[in-house]
Amino acid sequence: VMWILDGYTVTDRYPLSQRESLETMTDDSLQDSGGFQTLPTDEINYLRNSVKVTVDAYDGTVTLYEWDESDPILKAWQGVFPDAVEPRSEIPAEVMVHLRYPEDMFKAQRYQFQRYHVTNASEWFEGSSRWEVPQDPQNDKKLQPPYRLFSDVGSGDTWSLTSVYVPRNK
């Protein structure tokens, strides 16, 4: 039995990029709010799912696997700790079939897409075409979580995340 976790590289110092609260971007009615206490700052402007982590449930062995091979922050850490992260090619096939797109990454991207989906400059500056993730009908203080879908798309079973947007302030 293995636990699989997603490892992220984050910073608040990426040039020419707006900072946002990670908690705000990932908060919804299903989110446990205790996970952000280990971050030195909640505001980030760079987020990559750079590492997949496995934890052996029997003996506690932790293995880090490089997932995003082009991440410069991960490359810097690998320069300091060269043996800490295994190459992506070393991920066992029986683990690879269980890897999923990270939900927190999806939530951060959907948060940004609310504003940055607009391609017309005047509409972007006016904010007239902005979207928002709707509130959860069962908890009006929290956002609706993404839908988790498992379906057969012809080429086999597929797991996916999807989300709904509504026009902002309408």
Regions found by a protein language model. Give the residues of each.
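Extended, regular secondary-structure scaffolds
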Residues: 2-6, 19, 25-44, 49, ...
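Exposed beta-strand-loop-beta-strand "reactive/processing" segments of non-cytosolic proteins
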Residues: 1-32, 36-54, 125-170
